[in-house]
Amino acid sequence: MKYHDLRDFLTLLEQQGELKRITLPVDPHLEITEIADRTLRAGGPALLFENPKGYAMPVLCNLFGTPKRVAMGMGQDDVSALREVGKLLAFLKEPEPPKGFRDLFDKLPQFKQVLNMPTKRLRGAPCQQKIASGDDVDLTRLPVMTCWPDDAAPLITWGLTVTRGPHKERQNLGIYRQQLIGKNKLIMRWLSHRGGALDFQEWLAARPGERFPVSVALGADPATILGAVTPVPDTLSEYAFAGLLRGTKTEVVKCLSNDLEAPASAEIILEGYIEPGEMAPEGPYGDHTGYYNEVDNFPVFTVTHITQREDAIYHSTYTGRPPDEPAVLGVALNEVFVPILQKQFPEIVDFYLPPEGCSYRLAVVTMKKQYAGHAKRVMMGVWSFLRQFMYTKFVIVCDDDVNARDWNDVIWAITTRMDPARDTVLVENTPIDYLDFASPVSGLGSKMGLDATNKWPGETQREWGRPIVKDPEVTARIDAIWDELAIFK
């Protein structure tokens, strides 16, 4: 699935019936969300609203509204192929030297992909075809959506924020929502553990009082966007990973007002800075939890330049109670996580983040248990191995005879293989999502692990039950006469 930029990708989607153009005027205030939500719940196409009311710029929604389109954005034909992306990431996270000539030959495709990792810097780029600076900067000209009735203000949702710490060569790319508060002002809502916030804190320590340069790309190519939400190893830049996905080097261009590099083919680039100490109350906003979050203070992003392509497209989304676009992304990225976890914990058979659990708050793991206490080791590993699971509140561990993606199976294991006192692990005072208002303290709460595996000697003193298994010979005999019985005819 080869493409160069967002527009190229939209052409591919349209050819496959995965894009619908909406010519009827629709309001970015609430109406686009209503249409996008109904479409996503029905498994429908990406939507390009060509005539948003009050604006000259079209709005793109539901780009990643199905797992298939997420896979297409990662250069794959179907979701199952995302396991290969996970295997590549696992290899890059902990590369192993070839064990011999045959192993070297087997690894050649991976080494060949690595050649696409370096970025290609352009002198001029499509994203700088039109330039606004100074008093000409006006964010209110963008068709920024208001998604829910009680949202505080229009909200940029798919902004790809580019930052760099003072002592780093590698840039960080992150998706952080941004509240519109003026013609050239946005609130940058990044949590303290995220890459952009860490870069900012390092900047404040190294250069106190100096403005922190920031750029935000809107409408980047899907590989670059997905690179920012995928568990990329800390030693690998999101741009490099995007090159691996796309099969070509990521093209970047130096921003006009700072030394950051932005995606050259992005539709819109916002350039500016964060003034140390300039904060503003952000929210409330309806979020992926299905609730409005509480108001809190975050840094203000001052925009000094807006550069864009001719006939630019504004890329947006909404977040709400699952299913929403982040939940769909979670379903697809789940396949990427499995090989990464399996490389560290080979005993893991499957790993599942149910979308109804807000994509990351509950995980189900199935494993080949090998000794007493093994399930507890795995649950601790899930919480600690990847930072993406730092906020996972519940981890359920089952044996490999259980289907992690079938609640009937999982609930059967919980109710037949668990003693609540013995098999429940509670860990207090751990990092918790700021949006989780159920936690007693903002950003700090507890976690629960459920060991729903068969118990081994040392874990129980009782004779353990044997699962009922049908006689295969009887099953075969009944299969042979089933149609003749005509029970359902």
From Swiss-Prot:
Matching SUPFAM superfamilies: FMN-binding split barrel, UbiD C-terminal domain-like
Transmembrane intervals: none
Cofactor(s), by name: prenylated FMN; Mn(2+)
Topology with respect to the bilayer: Peripheral membrane protein
Binding, prenylated FMN: 175-177, 189-191, 194-195
EC numbers: 4.1.1.98
Any GO BP: ubiquinone biosynthetic process
Note on how the cofactor is bound: Binds 1 prenylated FMN per subunit.
Localization of this protein: Cell membrane
Pathway the protein contributes to: Cofactor biosynthesis; ubiquinone biosynthesis
Catalytic activity: a 4-hydroxy-3-(all-trans-polyprenyl)benzoate + H(+) = a 2-(all-trans-polyprenyl)phenol + CO2
GO molecular function terms noted in the UniProt entry: 3-octaprenyl-4-hydroxybenzoate carboxy-lyase activity; metal ion binding
Keywords assigned: Cell membrane, Decarboxylase, Flavoprotein, FMN, Lyase, Manganese, Membrane, Metal-binding, Ubiquinone biosynthesis
Main EC class the enzyme belongs to: lyase
Active site per UniProt: 287
Cellular-component GO terms for this entry: cytosol; plasma membrane
Residues that hold Mn(2+) according to the record: 172, 238
Keyword Metal-binding: yes
Membership in a protein family: Belongs to the UbiD family.
Complexes and interactors: Homohexamer.
Function: Catalyzes the decarboxylation of 3-octaprenyl-4-hydroxy benzoate to 2-octaprenylphenol, an intermediate step in ubiquinone biosynthesis.
Identification of the protein by name: 3-octaprenyl-4-hydroxybenzoate carboxy-lyase
Gene this protein is translated from: ubiD
